[in-house]
Each structure stands twice: as C-alpha cells, then as structure tokens.
Amino acid sequence: MDYLKALLGMTNEYPFFRKNDLPAEPCREIRLAGTGRRFAVTGDYQEPARNHCAAVCLANAMICLKTDRTVKQEERDRLFRRAYALLGNGPLFTREFRKGTGNALFEAGLPGCRLRPCGSPGEVRSCLEKGSPCAVLVMISSLNWHWVLAVGCREYEDGSFYLRICDGWNARADRWLRWGGPVRIRSVTAIEKKKAAASL
C-alpha cells in the first residue's frame, strides 16, 4: 500500500532500495571517497526552509567535493546556508538548480567546477569514476519530485544499474535508486571538480 501511495504522489516516502534489497549477483561497484560520512538532511534545516531538497542536495555535493578533510556540522550548516541563499525553497526545476549551483560552488571555495548533464548509465558511471557526485531529480508522480545525490553505483551483468544515493532524509548514503525503476529519473547533473594543474 505504501508503494502505491508513493506512486500516486500521496506521500513523501519514495520506494528507494536498501542494500539488502539489491540483487545478490556479482556486480561492478563504484563509490566516491567519503561516502560513509554524515551528510546534511532536510530535517536539519526546518526554519525558514520549505521544500529545500535541492539546497540539501547541493550542500551534500559540496561536502563530497571537499573529500580532503572531515566536514563537521558547522561546515555542513555553512554549506547549506550558501546553497539555500542561492537556490531557496523548491520545487526547483533542473535549469534553476544548475543556474544557482555555479555561484554556490564558487562561494564555497570550489571555483572552476563544471556542470555536466548525464543522460545514460554509462555517462553517470564515467562521472562517478572520475570522483564527480551527481545531482539527480527524481519523481514518483507529476506533482511529487525530489533532489537526491548519487555518490556511487552498481552495474550488474544483466544491465541493471543502481545509483547509491544520499536521499536528503537519511544522514548516510545508504539508499539505492534503480535506473528505469519505479522512481523516475528526470535529470542527472554531474558536478566535476576542477583538476589540479600538473607540476612541471
């Protein structure tokens, strides 16, 4: 019944998968560094924010891009405030998300990041292999969408493809989204960090 409610848009419970729900067959897995850390969640920022999953998603992307050190709660709060100041309350379409993201990354000390639209599992896998988190706009009904952050993936021999996500409601990246599954993927935007210049 919960699954049916989710598909009809009567709840915010998206039918994401847990690790023990995934196929048991051998697979190829990619995982960004630092995915075991605590991420920002919408529940951390109730006032004055509403429908702020896009800002939380962007804050979590910035956390991933700062893999060289531990990100404490104060830093998570600061990154969220930056993202929220530029993105505001949702719902946000992909174009609006991308427009605010460049400025937020620059202000967070991550200049030179590039946004790359991804339209296939292969493109997403390639970006994740390079260490780029991917902002994913998903929907379960025409009026019920949500931003999540892909921080890894699994690809099986039968071609099934799962994204490891920070869903914005749980502090750990322990949910999975199946490509072509019941939760529809509307867009994927990889956030590619500027490469350090090679020393001569």
Which residue stretches match the model-derived regions?
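Conserved active-site-adjacent core of cysteine acyl-enzyme catalytic domains
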Residues: 15, 26, 77-199
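Active-site-adjacent structural segments surrounding the nucleophilic cysteine of cysteine proteases
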Residues: 1-91, 158, 197-199
